Amino acid sequence: MPMTRDFFATAPKGLEPLLVRELDGLGAESIKETRAGVEFRGTLETAYRVCLWSRLANRILMSLDRFAAATPEALYDGVQRTDWGRHFGPGATLAVDFSSRRSAITHTLFGAQKVKDAIADQFLEHCGRRPSVRLERPDIRINVHLDADQAVIGLDLSGDSLHRRGYRTEAGPAPLKENLAAAVLIRAGWPDIAARGGSLIDPMCGSATLLIEGALLAADIAPGSFREYFGFLAWKGHDLELWRKLLTEARERAEAGLARLPPILGYDLDRRAIHLALDNIDRAGLRGRIHVERKVAADVRPKGRPGLVVVNPPYGERLGDVESLIPVYREFGETLQRHFRGWNAALLTGNFELAFQIGIRAGRYHTLYNGALECRLFLFDIAPERFFTPRSGVPETEGQKKLRQIVEKARRGAIPAEQSEMFANRLRKNLRNLGTWARRNGVSCYRLYDADLPEFAVAVDIYQGEKLWVHVQEYEAPASVDPAKAQSRLAGAVAMIPEVLEVPREQIFLKVRRRQKGDAQYVKQGQTAHFHVVEEGGWRFWVNFEDYLDTGLFLDHRITRGLIQQVARDRHFLNLFAYTGTATVYAAGGGAASTTTVDMSHTYLDWAGRNLALNGFGERDHLRIQADCLDWLEQAVDRRRRYGLIFLDPPTFSNSKRMTGSFDIQRDQGPLLKKVVSLLEPGGMLIFSTNRRRFRLDETALAGCAVEDVSRVTLPKDFERNPRIHACWRILAPDRQR
């Protein structure tokens, strides 16, 4: 019986879940997704198949030994434990890759040299000669990774990164790596579309990487079949007969696959790109199978059966100014809407705002990395109900228009200086105190001002992402206050924000906060769909300053989310009235066994999914359910579902038309809490929060549970001026197993 070995497949960040599925299909066993790759077990044939057929992996490492290496001497001794003469001879060329994390040996060149010395000294002792070093295409490549002073030493079977298929010797500007291109196509559902006979079109094909990878997928061609070099060809354990058998099998599959290849077409305006594309297509053996020609993207038209339009357009970071690209995206979007209805589309871009110029609402989003550059893959169904009118240039929202008018008034002297200066002084004071606190504690999103001065009833929130954004909420004045005076005070306050915070007006967003009624919490304020990414607690979230009443991230629950992360490990987590799922991200990050996110709004549930995806959490263990939470609770109780951790943050009041009746948290808390507690496992925890002021907890509904008021504990420093912003309890179910 063939010997089973341990292997590790490295992969670009974000591709690990796809690689797990691919390895499973290639016969790997004991598959485990880890940081920067996937562990698996298999025979030598399994490893050869992965080297030949993996479309996603970078390198395949065969584990040789593991040992403690807290010092250079321990590393040297550990490397010498392996009998290197069993793997290669002294006449072979050698390269060593060394990496280190959380270890005493931090210098990678020093670590690599120590490994080389240990191997060379062993050969000198046994053979009287040593292998020579060759950095490019060595006969043998050794990989050593040190993590927490534990070394893993392996043989790099790939030799060179597997994304280098061999068909591309030149590329145009901003090239796309071949395994990333394959991931884009797999995420876009191209294998299924191709199986149905659908066409593949790339309107900005560049050097044809997406087109060629699409053909390899559709025709069942092994991506490693073009390569002449692998890291096992000079290895003493290499089974040449087995390798030749696998190559023959791959050739037979390719011949059969090419006979059913659907139409694949590419276009580009750049003559040089078309020449490169044709050369690459020739080297891939696909001449006559892929059609490319010079044409502007806006003039591309469908050919063949409806299929997939895939594109990796320029996005500013690589080929120029973002503003100049808006017409490119917009014209391309208009082409899709007019001529490609019924098709699917996939767009990979490093600029989220440019993607909205397409004018089609994406059904799904995935975060991928083009090298170190974070990108988003947007997947579209091209149908009229998904179309919207994108904004022109850098459009001005109603809030920004109001802000501009206020600032212009201040410049003309139409706003009394004393009004402005009073607010500005308080803002500067808060910036000194809270700004310093935020920097020291790694808090990038916080409330800077919260109606500190009664005359200026606004909240000013700071959001740090790729830029610094300021979100200003004007609290609606009571009926007893003269509207003219209220507006004058608002103007005096807001006019100073750009100057004091040194933030461009375009990065400041102004809203009026009113009481929510019925479906109000789900209704958009505008139609811009304008999102940004911010960070909190090491996690990343999409926020929207313009289209909804709230931004998608409740800042007052920062500590509450951290508490959830602390206690989530190995628990099944339920998030009720989940909003954008930020608590779910924290639970997943804390090691929850699974998460279930329930909300009535499709918009917010989709937002939650994008937040999970942004942080690398796939759909396998993270269920999202669109439902009236009260109705869903009834069903969950009947089905006797159980969770180890539940977060309950219901609305204060709701009479939405999508609900069977009105809901008042003070009035209806008893039945609600009883049902939620009944879903807890023995010893399980419920974190219950409400924003209702003067809320009184009915502890009779929690009989038998341990109840702890954590309102003060979960109140962040930046909300201490408003201690009743929320009330929060930690509720423990009785441990019936005692």
UniProtKB/Swiss-Prot annotation:
Keywords, comma-separated and alphabetical: Cytoplasm, Methyltransferase, RNA-binding, rRNA processing, S-adenosyl-L-methionine, Transferase
Sequence ranges assigned to domain THUMP in this UniProt record: 46-157
Entry EC no(s): 2.1.1.173, 2.1.1.264
Top-rank lineage group of the source organism: Bacteria
Locations listed in the record: Cytoplasm
SMART domains for this protein: THUMP
Gene Ontology terms for molecular function: 23S rRNA (guanine(2445)-N(2))-methyltransferase activity; RNA binding; rRNA (guanine-N7-)-methyltransferase activity
InterPro entries, sorted: 23SrRNA_methyltr_KL, DNA_methylase_N6_adenine_CS, RlmKL-like_Mtase, RlmL_1st, SAM-dep_methyl-trfase, SAM-dependent_MTases_sf, THUMP_dom
Enzymatic reactions: guanosine(2445) in 23S rRNA + S-adenosyl-L-methionine = N(2)-methylguanosine(2445) in 23S rRNA + S-adenosyl-L-homocysteine + H(+); guanosine(2069) in 23S rRNA + S-adenosyl-L-methionine = N(2)-methylguanosine(2069) in 23S rRNA + S-adenosyl-L-homocysteine + H(+)
One cellular component term from this protein's GO annotations in UniProt: cytoplasm
SUPFAM superfamilies, per the entry: S-adenosyl-L-methionine-dependent methyltransferases
NCBIfam families: PRK11783.1
Family stated for the protein in its record: Belongs to the methyltransferase superfamily. RlmKL family.
Function field: Specifically methylates the guanine in position 2445 (m2G2445) and the guanine in position 2069 (m7G2069) of 23S rRNA.
PANTHER family reported for this sequence: RIBOSOMAL RNA LARGE SUBUNIT METHYLTRANSFERASE K/L, RIBOSOMAL RNA LARGE SUBUNIT METHYLTRANSFERASE K_L
Protein name in the entry: Ribosomal RNA large subunit methyltransferase K/L
Species per Swiss-Prot/TrEMBL record: Methylococcus capsulatus (strain ATCC 33009 / NCIMB 11132 / Bath)
